[in-house]
Amino acid sequence: MMSKHIFQKEPVLSIATCLAIISAFFVPPDAEYLGYIDFRTLAILFSLMAVMAGLRGQSVFDRLGHALLSHTRTTLQLTVVLVGLCFFSSMLITNDVSLLTFVPFTFVVLNRLNASVRRKLLLPIVCMQTIAANLGSMLTPLGNPQNLYLYGKSGMDMSSFVLLMLPYSIISLVLLAIWAVWLCREGSDIVVTHSAVNSEPDKKLIALYGILFVACLLVVLRVLPYGAAFAAILVCAFFADRPTLGRVDYSLILTFVALFIFIGNLGRIEAFSGWLQNILAGHEVLVSVLASQVTSNVPAAILLSGFTDNFRALIIGTDLGGLGTLIASMASLISYRQIANEVPAEKGHYFAMFTISNVVFLAILMGAWALT
């Protein structure tokens, strides 16, 4: 029963761990295992998650949302703010944190509207927020875990990375804007009532986390050594805000470790390594998009990066590959679970809307890629 519960709660970690264990039968553990682990990626990942958890704990993002909503007067303005928050914030705070923060916030806001408006807007807006977070996050190395990993692996500079993904981000933003206008084509004035965020923020903690976030940026830009920033964040959180350490997603870090071991072992199995390299050669984008549909894009990025050095194609493929199935990006499950918990009768409708809209977005963006 316990193993079933663990699998249901952490399916990706469970599968990654099983794959690592199975691969160890073919390549018995030895000193080379340590060389599989990308400690820089793990340290940056932990650092970012700890800083974001600290800022969320101080309701920084909720306050930002309330401030922006204070200026909304129509359903279109409301939709643009709620979706825009996810699109733009995900570039810096990751797609996961964006959805964890702003999807529950959306329920709170829409519950203050009349029933007919809420019914019309709820599912489309949450669906748009999910797509917005996944597509907004692809513009920067900080936006999602696979970008962070592939950016470090590729040795690209920040400007090259942003320019690589900028066309897809612009197209995504235009598509979301068109959807928002269409959704609110029978626009009406609304009144959004605002409630104060419960607790007063600790301004010293917010300033501290702001400084630590800048340190994370400097590490990503390869200005600061990752070890120093990791140690500083760990020590600061431990002594200044210990509960934050309990809100870090350690399962994601363990998933990375398990996948590093699995991929490292596969690379030492010559027959499999040669086969996968042949499949990938010249088809990196398509293979990574397809792999993401089944494994989700983070495992796909880590797996395929061991068998090609065309990291630009992998970045495009795994970012676009976050569209499609519900598990193509694990961040999408955050929104689905929220829908299932808050309006369980609508989860089937949401799933259908999510799948159709994701396929449409994926088809258009893949068409844009094919034309480049």
Residue ranges and their predicted role:
Residues S3-K9, D30-T41, M156-Y168, N198-D202, ...:
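Interfacial loop-to-helix junctions that mark the boundaries of transmembrane helices
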Residues M2, H66, W182-G210, R242-G246:
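Flexible interhelical linker loops that connect adjacent transmembrane helices
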Residues V162-L173, L286-T372:
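C-terminal transmembrane helix pair
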Residues S3-E32, L42-S59, V181-E186, A215-P243, ...:
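Structural signal for alpha-helical transmembrane segments and their membrane-water exit/capping regions
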Residues Y36, Q58, D62-G65, I211-D309:
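Transmembrane helical segments that form the transport core of multi-pass membrane transport proteins
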Residues F39-T41, S70-V83, L113-I125, K203-A207, ...:
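Membrane-interfacial loop-to-helix junctions in multi-pass transporters
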Residues F88-M138, I302-I316, P344-H349, W369:
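Hydrophobic transmembrane alpha-helices that form the pore/transport pathway of multi-pass ion
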Residues V117-C184, I190-S195, Y336-G367:
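Membrane-core helix-loop-helix motifs of multi-pass transport proteins
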